[in-house]
Curated annotation (Swiss-Prot):
Residues 7-129 form the MsrB domain. It comes from Escherichia coli O81 (strain ED1a). The active site is at C118 (nucleophile). Its EC number is 1.8.4.12. This is Peptide methionine sulfoxide reductase MsrB. InterPro entries: Met_Sox_Rdtase_MsrB (IPR028427), Met_Sox_Rdtase_MsrB_dom (IPR002579), Mss4-like_sf (IPR011057). The keyword DNA damage does not apply. It comes from the Bacteria. Belongs to the MsrB Met sulfoxide reductase family. GO terms for molecular function: peptide-methionine (R)-S-oxide reductase activity; zinc ion binding. Keywords: Metal-binding, Oxidoreductase, Zinc. One of its GO terms (biological process) is response to oxidative stress. One of its GO terms (cellular component) is cytoplasm.
Length: 137
């Protein structure tokens, strides 16, 4: 795992929601994320360490209320953890570089993978492929 900023640094530099999601395994309310409707070409990075996580070409509208992707940039970019919280069986996804909470992956996505990476906007930074503009979720 990469060197992660201290909790004090993160609290100072992140919004309350970004800290809650990435550090406390929280979930932003559905349909509220800043990157949910983003359709621009580019790359979605981890908000904490800037590691690339998802290409915009793999993003799709799943209707679930959070940005959804059918595959990460690489298997190493994501860490998978069994999550039995809230009386459910799910697979939590975290940044493979810094361990920040991203969301969950479900086996109900489109081809070619059949997976839906359901990701909190608050855990992402989008970099536009054309002009390099960055948008924090």
């Amino acid at each position: 795992m990469a060197n992660k900023p201290s909790a004090e640094e993160l609290k100072k530099n992140l919004s309350e929601m970004q800290f809650y999601v990435t550090q406390n395994h929280g979930t932003e309310p559905p349909f509220t994320g800043r990157l949910l409707h983003n359709k621009r070409d580019g790359v979605y990075h981890c908000l904490i360490c800037d590691a690339p996580l998802f290409h915009s070409q793999t993003k799709y509208d799943s209707g679930c209320g959070w940005p959804s992707f059918y595959e990460p940039v690489s298997e190493e970019s994501i860490r998978y953890i069994k999550d039995l919280s809230h009386g459910m069986q799910r697979i939590e996804i975290r940044c493979g570089n810094c361990d920040a909470h991203l969301g969950h992956v479900f086996p109900d996505g489109p081809h070619p993978t059949g997976e839906r990476y359901c990701v909190n906007s608050a855990s992402l930074r989008f970099t536009d492929g054309e002009n390099g503009e960055e948008i924090n979720g």
